Amino acid sequence: SELVKMRRLGLEPIPKLNFATTHDIWLKEYSRMVSTDIYYRVCADLIEEVSALFGKPRFFHLGMDEELASYQTRQDYAVVRQNDLWWGDLYFFIGEVEKNGIRPWVWSDYAWHKPDVFFRKMPKSVLQSNWYYGSGFNLDSLKEPNRTYVKLYDDLEKHGYDQVPTGSNHSVPDNFESTVDYCKKAVDPSRLLGFMTAPWRPTLAHCLERHREAIGQVVRAMKKFER
């Protein structure tokens, strides 16, 4: 299987199913049944099946980013959970992952918009991935909203969350290495579980060069990190 092939190459496959309503088109008709009994049964079955297929991986990424109306203006069908419903569904997903003996993992951008609520309600057991794809990291000179995006790395550290900071070559070519440089200083090593790159290009032939560039950036950042 593909998972066996990946492991033979020394890679650790981690499942990711994004349950945010902005990104759940993969659920097909069930994406239009959000927060119903049928939806919860389907999502629980999916999490259990994927957990078994991946052989009880260390982590399970649940997505949960960008669930705001502003991110869905180009979609013909838009739905947004918020307030207690969003948190209730997140806790449901977390519980289903933990039932399978796996640590849940989410994107952290909810904290950009409602930091007080986030830090009051987000369990420390959930691995966090803040993301920022720009080129500047100086909090003294950054303008909003970029300053908020970068500062969240520091805020997650201040509140004691484990992190996998995320960079990208989606917008600029130097972001990933700069992300590593910044977070190596901002995050305690005991809470820095790694880094992730997200080129946000499909795995198609015409995008191959962008993926190669991303891999090269990771390699360069690793060499600098290990010095």
What are these language model-derived features?
Residues 159-227:
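Substrate-binding cleft of secreted/luminal carbohydrate-active enzymes
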Residues 1, 39-44, 82-92, 143-152, ...:
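Well-ordered, non-membrane alpha-helical segments in soluble/globular domains
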Residues 52, 99, 151-154, 158, ...:
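Polar/charged alpha-helical tracts
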Residues 73-80, 136-145, 208-210:
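Short, flexible/disordered intra-domain loops and linkers
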Residues 1-127, 132:
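Aromatic-lined carbohydrate-binding surfaces of glycoside hydrolases
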Residues 49-53, 96, 155, 181-186:
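A generic secondary-structure signal
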Residues 115-169, 175:
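Glycoside hydrolase catalytic-domain groove-lining segments
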